[in-house]
């Protein structure tokens, strides 16, 4: 049923005091240890598959329910609890904790709702009976975020009748990119989408400078078989990108480093050790200083919904449904 609601749960939540007072929202929420941000979590599972421990726990839950004579009455039934990082937590509260680790209280409520729907959708997409471990979750949640999550709890994004894969990230390069460029997997609704307002956001452009010696040290640390010799200007060449910025600059699919081709992800995240925040970047060399300048645009993987773009759309009057329809084209809400 479209825009499904659990009225009793909503009433119970309305009568429950939020975990924090509004005054506490000025302090960044504490994040659980030994976890990763949502965007990294999604990327890892897109490339490596759903966490096996979570799948195993889901199978145990199903077996336990079957032994007690419980049937999975409805695949779309709203969960009462989410097992978040090993802790059984009331479902709305758990969802709000994940959202609060992804966006802060300054976000427009419609953008927060869009993020909440995207997160809930991903939890359904994983099909682990709402068991999730290793994911950043805030210890405290503001009234604003808790209320926004409550309003859309149970809604999710569907494609061909099934929960969609709904990655989010902080800030695009002015456009999002296709999933196959960064993740290596293709989804019909994760294609390039214009997000031009992101170009005006704080942190849009980042530049770092490395000497040839520093780059060589990083490359050798990443892979000792990489041979950086001869003219330094030929050491690093972007070999494939999507042209998000221009014909010469975009989200990078492959880079040639010392004759060895690696993915843009491995170059930015592993070789450069996350010194740049985006996978949309350009590399240039200056012989006079024997230095490499690496310029990146945006922040995050660039696939799916730009949270900065969503916030700008919300500020301009768009609803969460309109935001989701833009960043996941061809999908619907259920």
Task: Cite the ranges covered by each PLM segment.
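Conserved, single-site charged/polar hotspot
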Residues: 1-334
